[in-house]
């Protein structure tokens, strides 16, 4: 089997909080089940020029889109941001369209779901976003209203979508899709981060120290 790769698409105005839970766990592997291979998060940009996130962080992409080849075992994370309606994202959206057919896992949150919607990629797949009415208003090519589900995050085959205020649920759906956490580990990890109750930390530790 081809080695699984994880890509984080980076661009000006990307929303820092939306991918934090997810990439921290994927890159560290600290709660992975014993037979799960380690992963490295690779940042990919339209080009290799430095970008600035919404929070003011400067990120120099590891690779450009031209250097990024998405395989069926790979994951690409598409964060939200203020620019998804702009032409600069057309190259990644084209690549994502091909990758969806190939079986690559596509994880899109917040504004990135609008980019997918306007390309017609959500017209026949279960999905969610920040708001259906807003999606209908800003995405003229979107015809997937019957597949829209109200909820923080939705998974359908190789596609995960989420609201921008649900980064934790977004992470859970992607981690579940990749099958890198044992089910009880994922459940305890979610409860700890969702409730902030210390008993779930000890429950989490017990799931990985057996």
From Swiss-Prot:
* KW Transcription regulation (keyword) present: no
Q: Which domain of life is it from?
A: Bacteria
Q: Which GO terms describe its molecular function?
A: peptidase activity
One GO term describing the cellular component: cytoplasm
- For whether the record's keyword set contains Protease, the answer is yes
UniProt lists the family membership as follows: Belongs to the peptidase C56 family.
Report the EC number(s), separated by commas if there are several: 3.2.-.-
Could you tell me the gene encoding this protein? Answer: yoaZ
What is this protein's name? Answer: Uncharacterized protease YoaZ
Q: Could you list this entry's UniProt keywords, alphabetically sorted.
A: Hydrolase, Protease
